[in-house]
Every structure is written in C-alpha cells, then in structure tokens.
Amino acid sequence: YRRSSDLIGTLTFVDEKGRYGALGHGISDVDTGELLHISKGALYQAEILGIQKGKSGSPGELSGLIRYEPGQIIGAVDTNSKNGIYGSFYDRRAGIPVKKTEVAYKQELEVGPASILCCVDGSVKEYDAEITRIDMNHEDTNKSFVIHVTDPELLEITGGIVQGMSGSPILQKGKFAGAVTHVFV
C-alpha cells in the first residue's frame, strides 16, 4: 500500500473531450514492480531544473520541481494502466501547447524518419528521431517499435532519450505514432 507516488513524466495527448494520457507506461511499486492501484490523483505541471545526460550504462534523467499547490493542478488522475496514466485534463491555461494531430494506425508505421516532442529547456520542441525497428506482434504493446534520437541539439543536451521523457509523443509523417516508454542503457 502506498499513500502517494510522484515522478516526472510527459503529457502524451489530450483528446477533444478533455481526457489525457501521459507517461506511456504505468506507475509501479518500486519494491515489488507491481502496477499500483490508483484511487485518485492529481496531474501537476513540473519545471525541469536539470538534466543528467544519458550515456552507455547510465540512462540519464530529467530532474525537476513539482509544486504541490492547488493552483498548479492541471488534471486529475483516475487510471493507472500498463500503457500509462489517464484522466481529465482541465487546465489549458498551463501553457502546454495542445495541437490537433491525426493518429497513425500501427500498419502505417515504417522504419525511417520520425520525431519526438519533449520539453528539456522550458518549452516543448520537436526533435528529429528515427524508428529503427517495428514489431507489430510484440506481446508488450509498449515495445512495438524502437526509436533513436538523431537530432544533434537533443543529443547534445540529453545524450538521447532519458528518464523523465516517458510519455513524449512520437510523430511520423505528421501523425501521432506512439509515446516514449523505455530508455535503453
């Protein structure tokens, strides 16, 4: 039993009804690895304060500050699943850019150029990446394709994908293709 859990992750999408998805993977108990049951929770906007660059053998991470004040809540968490956290997004004034984007069918994905949206310096930017492998039949839906960062700017800042980027939207040919879920070490 856990009273609370806090972590830095990324808002993945907000639908037209104001429902959001974030993180790209579930929140698990640090001791048992079991998916936590969440009865209620709040989504807060975080401020990224530092970046530990990822390198071989070390995943790197975004570190930030979460202000646990009522005025900082931008949504409610009502679901924790293996594919992420979900709930109601109710503060569009948070300055988070939400842009209508078509969703790609998994059959449309292909090895080749893609991009990820993430915030490493105070604003959301699109960075070049590449889908290098696709497995349509992988038993874990969180591992249906592999993406590598190719953008020189993001590689310089983070070394690639780091902890805290989980949930970052992945785009291919202008369509929403998925979310960052894991970091390769």
Model-derived features: positions:
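Charged, low-complexity helical/coil segments in non-catalytic cytosolic or luminal regions
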Residues: 12, 18-144, 183-184
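Short strand-coil-strand connectors
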Residues: 119-123, 150, 173
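Extracellular trypsin-like serine protease catalytic domains
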Residues: 143-152
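Catalytic nucleophile loop of clan PA
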Residues: 158-180
